[in-house]
Structures are given as structure tokens and as C-alpha cells.
Amino acid sequence: MNMSNKRNQQPSYIADHFSSLDQVITSLREAGLESSNLILGIDFTKSNEWTGRYSFNRKSLHAIGKRQNPYEKAISIIGRTLSPFDEDDLIPCFGFGDVTTRDQYVFSFYPENKSCDGLENAVKRYREIVPHLKLSGPTSFAPVIDAAINIVEQNNMQYHVLVIIADGQVTRNPDVPLGRLSPQEEATMNSIMAASHYPLSIVLVGVGDGPWDTMKQFDDNIPHREFDNFQFVNFTKIMSEHKDAAKKEAAFALAALMEIPFQYKATLSLNRKPVRSSHQHHKPLPPPPEVIERDNAVRSVPNQMTETAEKSDRLAPSTVPVCPICLTNPKDMAFSCGHTTCKECGVVITTCPLCRQPITTRIRLYT
């Protein structure tokens, strides 16, 4: 790796200087930070299916329902906090750890590496793609860090904040000798060190049951960096405290962002010229094929909605109500607005074909 030799010791620890979120926001502004340029990386490794045993009522951490899952909560809190500093409101969002990326690549939430248009779109897109992903592994944060480095280079070395939300630490198999790093640990550490040559802060948000002991060591013990560019935050621990929701959200945002003013100031003294590391940066993959198929199905539905809904009112027998979209299958899925379709059509639409209200609840109907 092409790293500077002038830093033989780990960077000085940046202490917890703030006691409130307002102080963090004020310090961000005083440091001259005007744009947060947020980047999101989401962990889709298979361990998400069981690491919510204690912290998320035995459900998958990616379970989609009426209430937000831990990933949705973390995205929302971070997004709301950093939105005052975001100029274009565009958020590059990446997934990693599924069967298409494993520990080597990332996929973009949208085709052609398109960014999400604001926080609400990022959460909405997350909810759209999750049901169509196949979780896998192992866990490495190197690909998403490398993707963030590429974004910084493509944006004239402007300051960015990469927020990685994950359910576990970097994969380390039991057969790795004591004192040695696993391939995933080595790649992640190399990427963090390479990222320290760029105006890029990395915040790792831990959701689920953990464990997180290795990530705590990563926070303070990575050597040979130009500045202390990595911060780990235990989302589960903070959100499980006995406080009201608003205070817990503020505490989490504070823990995640408290080092950014000092990190931003540290980046001002960087050379700000692209530095190529020895490991290869891969271009983000498109969303997995199942997500593309879902998108294509949704795009085809609106062209049929008006005509098929009108036909269903005229043609559907009263004794066997049929779906107003396909005019074939029986109605066996109801929405919160009270209207019904078949389950095949109901799972791919986001608004009711009759009243156009957003679909927030889907209920299977049985005869």
C-alpha cells in the first residue's frame, strides 16, 4: 500500500468534547462544514437473520413491517441530523454482503449507480429492495469504504461522511492464528488507512446483538493513518437505555457525529490529491436481478391500472371477486385503505390502484 511513513504512531484519540447535539451542530458550522455529503452503506450479511434475537424480538434485523427496524431507525436519525448540512440532498446508498457482493463488491440501491434523492427516498428504497435480497457473507467493510473513496475522488476531493450500518464485526474465522488478521480484517484495515488520505470520515453504526469487541479496537488502534478517520457507535446499547425516544435519538446522533468537527479540521491539512492504494477498487454493481425484476414489474403496473380497474368493476362476478389489476386471480390481499387485489399484484405495487393512497399495510385474505 502506498502509505505515508511519517505517521508511525496511531493518531491521537479524539476525546468526547460535547454534551449535547446542538454543540455538535454548532461546532460543525464553526469548523466551516457546509455540506455533509452523506454516503450510506448497509450490511446484508446472513447473520442479520439471527442477531436480533435479544434486541429485536427474535426477528430479522431487516424485517419490514409497520414499525421501523433498527436499520431504518439508524438511517432516519443520521439523515435528519446531517440534512441541514447537505446541499444537494443526494445520498449514494450501497449494499454489501448479499449473494451478489459477498465480501468483494457493493451494489448501488439504484441502477447506473444513481443516488437516492434525500432521506425519505433512501428509506423508501431500502424497504423496496430488502424483500428481494438473498443474504450471504462474509463481512468486510473494505468494498464500501473503497466505493466511498471513489465518490470523494469523483467530487473534487470534497469532504464526505460514510455511515456504515452493520449487524456484526468483520469476519474472523476460528482457524486464524492469534495475532494474525483474517483476509476480511486485513482488507478492512487497509481500506481505513487508505481512506485517511482523503477528506472522508467513516462512522460504523452497530445494530443488533453484536458482538462488537473487535470494532471497539478498530476505533482507536488502527495504525499509520493521516488522521483519526474512524468512529464506532453501538446503536443497540444507546437505544436500549431507559430514556424517552427523543433523548435516545439525540444521544445516538451525538455519539455518531461528535468526532466529525475535529476530523473535518484534520482533513483541511491533507494534500487532497488522489492516492491509490495497492488493493483494487471495483465499480459498484447494479441492484441484484430480483430487485431489477421487481422494479420492472412495478413500472408496468401503472400503465394498466386505470383500464384494468374499470374493467374489473364491469366484469368481475360478484360471487368471485377478481384482482382489479390482472383481472385473473381472486382478491386475497387487502390494504389499509380497504381495497383489495391478489397477492401476486399486491406485493409489487406501492399505491392502491383504486384510490391511489400509499400502501402501508398488506393483509392476506383466506377463504
Swiss-Prot record:
Q: Pfam families given for it? A: Copine, zf-C3HC4_3
Q: Which GO terms describe its molecular function?
A: ubiquitin-protein transferase activity; zinc ion binding
Q: What is its EC number?
A: 2.3.2.27
Q: Which SMART domains match?
A: VWA (SM00327)
Q: Which InterPro entries match?
A: Copine_C, E3_ligase/Copine_domain, VWF_A, vWFA_dom_sf, Znf_RING, Znf_RING/FYVE/PHD
Compartments, as annotated in UniProt: Cytoplasm; Nucleus
Keywords from UniProt, A to Z, are:
Cytoplasm, Jasmonic acid signaling pathway, Metal-binding, Nucleus, Transferase, Ubl conjugation pathway, Zinc, Zinc-finger
Superkingdom? Eukaryota
Q: In which tissues is it expressed?
A: Widely expressed.
Q: Name one GO biological process term.
A: defense response to bacterium
What PANTHER family does its record include?
A: COPINE FAMILY PROTEIN 1, COPINE FAMILY PROTEIN 2
Name the UniProt record assigns to this protein: E3 ubiquitin-protein ligase RGLG3
Protein source organism: Arabidopsis thaliana (Mouse-ear cress)
Source lineage: Eukaryota, Viridiplantae, Streptophyta, Embryophyta, Tracheophyta
What's the gene?
RGLG3
